Amino acid sequence: MNRILILLFIVWIYILSIFKRKKLAYFSFLFGSVGMFVFLFVILYPLLTMPLTKFVCDLTGIIGNATGIFKAYSSYGILFIENIEAGPVSLYIDFECAGLVENLVFLSLLTFFPAYKWFEKIWIGIVGVLAVMSANVLRLTVICIMIHMWGNDVYYLAHTIVGRLLFYLLSISLYFYVFTRRQIRKQRIGEFEYNGEND
């Protein structure tokens, strides 16, 4: 497996260098981002999934302890939600809730995004990862609050619809600010002339 991964990495670097030499910016961005995500995911998935799960659980638990609505047991990756009618409800924080995929996608796109310099990418990468983690914690908090208020019957609505919708909206906002807005500002717009005057 390691040999195959190394071989694929060498091929990826070689093809990427061809795109760079030919100045094919779009293919460099696309091929580079996808390749970086795949390699990082294969390498980091077994290493960071559990630590990230515990970290997200601990961060969410701070809010739970402050409000008294739920408690975090990071060793097991579980949030225990207090509900008067149904009793304690457990919410297991799995791989999806860890935020590893979302962070790797963001960092991979940012690495090959040509509108930033390297020192800018490092700073934005740190802020972006913190933003994704915060959005994830907020999503879990909203899910816990909904279950606390209305019981286990709203689990599907809270987790699958409301929680994901909130997380995706925050992620789209981050992507717009980092990528789309920057690209628009980088565009050169010619001057317009109206009634003989430049505007």
Which stretches of residues belong to each language-model region?
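Hydrophobic N-terminal alpha-helices or hydrophobic patches in metabolic proteins across all domains
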Residues: M1-D199
